Amino acid sequence: MAGNELSGWESSDPTLYDGALWAITVDENTEYQRFRAVATMIVDHCANRLIVLDDTTHDRCAALISHMPHVISTAMINELVANPNRNIAAALAAGSWRDMTRVALTDPNRTRAMVEEDAANVEALLRNMANRLTLMANVLHGMTAQQGAPTAGDDKEMARFFVQGQPFREYKALTKEPDFAEHCETVELAIPETGWQQMLLESARRGEHIVRFDGYRQAMAQVRSSV
């Protein structure tokens, strides 16, 4: 999983895949030897990490961390363009706006195609996001009605909104440590002959990334994305 907001040959980057995580999608008909050949290329020849997913899990996660954010980011720049104070707002925009709208700067046709390909998952996430934002808007409306003093219920909802994501903040703080990879827990995976697809999917759900193979059905993984 790698990329940026740019497109075209002139935007190619030889370091794009450095340290990248690969997601290999398999199903019940995937032959282990074929999976193993691709996995070996990734960990041995590319020196990268990998996780194993099924198509459904891959598409849902891609919608969550890529496709839905592209829509949200695009909605933000649409909101600015439609605002009568857009020129002032654009002049005042700094780091927060830049970071949250970066992916909206990519080719809109590419973004549209990406979103349309995963429409059902993106729709569900956007409705979840709309519910979260509506809840916050309702809390703020209550504060306005109370002249800035939230009710006990509103205060509780406000606190919950801003602390719910704390596990992700802590996870990101850990990944910024220069020796993060060295301190990740290492686990050995014994890959069975049957049911290996589901076993490796559950490994990915625990945040384990395969970093090498010590045998045909023996892999070593690091716990790299446990939120």
Model regions and ranges:
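Rossmann-fold dinucleotide-binding core
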Residues: 1-49, 53, 59-62
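Short, Lys/Arg-enriched charge-dense amphipathic segments
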Residues: 20-26, 71-84, 100-111, 172-187, ...
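Hydrophobic transmembrane alpha-helix bundles
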Residues: 85-101, 117, 121-125, 184-205, ...
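Interdomain hinge/lid region at the active-site interface
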Residues: 87-170
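Glycine-rich loops and low-complexity Gly/Arg-rich segments
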Residues: 20-23, 48-49, 75-78, 128-129, ...
